[in-house]
Amino acid sequence: MTDRPVRARRPSKATTKTAGGRSAPAKRATKAATKKATATKATATKASATKAVTKKARPTKTSATKTSGTKATPTKTSALKGGETDPRSAKLSPTPREVSVGTDAAFASGGGQPRRRLKNISEVRHFFRTNDVPILFFGATPFNLLGLDRWVRNFTYITYYDAWDGAHPRVFTPTNKPYQEFESGEEINNWLLTNAEVRAHIDAATPRGVRPKVAMVFFNSETEDISKELGYDLILPAASLRQHLDSKIVTTQLGNEAGAPSVPNVLTRVDDWAGLQAVAEKAGLGDELVVQTPYGDSGKTTFFISSEADWKKHSADIVGEEIKVMRRINNRPVAVEAVLTRCGTIVGPFMSELIGYKRLTPARGGWCGNEMFPEVLTGESRRTATQLVRRLGDRLAEEGYRGFFEVDVLVDTDTNDVYLGELNPRISGASSITNVTAGAYADVPLFLFHILEYMNVDFDLDVDEINERWEELASADVWSQMVMKETDDIVQRLTATPRTGQYSLDASGGLVFRRPALDWHQLQNEREAFFLRIYGPGDYRWKGADLGVLVTKGRLQVDNGQGKSSLAIRARHLIDSIRAEYAGTPIAEPAPPRTNVGVKSG
């Protein structure tokens, strides 16, 4: 493997504002009827699992900001010219080849599950290291839970795109994927569930009489029906309950009942500017207001209103809706994930967010990454936020919810007050950082408590002790991730892309590809980074399309005071270096995309 530099260079005529390196698509297939599925080289269409999925083709417009309500974000339409055939739509002949299993838990022997009650973390670790039940994560890519196979035996990722070109032993991607367009993340997961290759792969890996466990970010009632018909256990709360809890109005009401207050607000309906003023004055919210509608991406359904002109600009989206009217505060958003179990709510590490950076996303206010470091929350603020999340978890239990959820916490930078922001009742894009912390290695990754809640085993864990330990250990670790989107107004078929794997800075400061890697867990210092490619050669890129995710130790932002941050010099260098590896051929005039592949649910 050569340390090929990944420095920025002059774009070729075939590219628009970006230049590329090289990457070779591979093909992969599986034998459906054999006891062990063998991996083969796969087509070069890759993607990310997260916030929403895309269709393969000529885009139609939107952005993938962090969402908190409706999840069927848009997708692109065909970018092929009339009569042009997608070269990836043809069925490929499988070429079997052996791969070595390189994930930790895979080496553990089976031996059946203990049926006695699990009483401590050591027993939980043993339970998962000897697990005989297939546990499957479905998605466009394995981004959200990548690396979890290190702890869980028989854990597999079923994905539409394969960023490793067949080299990851725990990623299965169907070989035959005729060209089609997906409208949402739910559609791509439902397609995977019903795919013949996928079903054969799962059947071959499932012992007789055992029901596979299935998890995913995006699902709906159709997903539930498919899983029931196939004999799979969907280890997630009901889709109808999740939809109910997605409402910002419901989140506010539940938080108030639980003693987890939001920023001073009033829930109401208004028909005109005078009505909004009257409501705000009565509630003592001041003249600068923030108005939110119940469902949708935060960046698209949050409106800042301080004048009649602002009202006229946004009134069409507000009138007729039940809305949340808040006092506008100077705040710092903080993300945290938690798991609601029968023993109580376990709270993960707190993370800051990367929001709206033009180098990463064309969407103003769009989520584009996270940082975890000791100073995200300290002292009393951390304790207050932890209690806020635990109270909300207890209230969610009364609604029948159990398992994983993410919460946005708002810290008032003027008063240091901590408020409940939004609830995201599902796996989120922050999970990738949560599962790699020092706390995760001291105990188990947070998501394992979610799986445990849905397994056929009894357990009695000291949640208070776990939370105290995680608060101490997680706050001492430093990790960051950036989600990189196409920011130029182009539509191209990619001819070269950076490889998935581990990168590092060479002696001259250039970013070079060091070696293939299955995940980012082996990173040691700030000179190293892991890049997860989403789109590969033969795929398309357009303005707003997710290109990949970069994970590294250390911070990627610098604080400028009063809760404001900017991208660090190191972050900008990493972004420019990775972007320089992309090259493509223009295929159409730029068109606004209708959806995108996101990597954070929300």
Identify the residue ranges that each predicted region occupies:
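Glycine-rich phosphate-binding loop of ATP-grasp-fold ATP-dependent ligases
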Residues: 264-265, 288-312, 333-335, 358-377
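A conserved helix-loop-beta module that forms one wall/lid of the active-site cleft
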Residues: 228-301, 587-588
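Intrinsically disordered, polybasic Lys/Arg-rich low-complexity tracts
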Residues: 3-92, 96-98
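ATP-dependent carboxylate/phosphate-activation module, predominantly the ATP-grasp catalytic core
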Residues: 327-334, 338-391, 424-451
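A long amphipathic alpha-helix within ATP-dependent nucleotide-binding catalytic cores
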Residues: 366-414, 449-478, 483, 569-582
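ATP-binding N-terminal substructure of ATP-dependent carboxylate-amine bond-forming enzymes
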Residues: 76, 80-244, 273-275, 562-601
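Conserved ATP-binding module of the ATP-grasp superfamily
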Residues: 261-263, 284-290, 304-335, 391-398
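Peripheral (often C-terminal) accessory segments that flank ATP-dependent C-N-forming ligase machineries
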Residues: 452-602
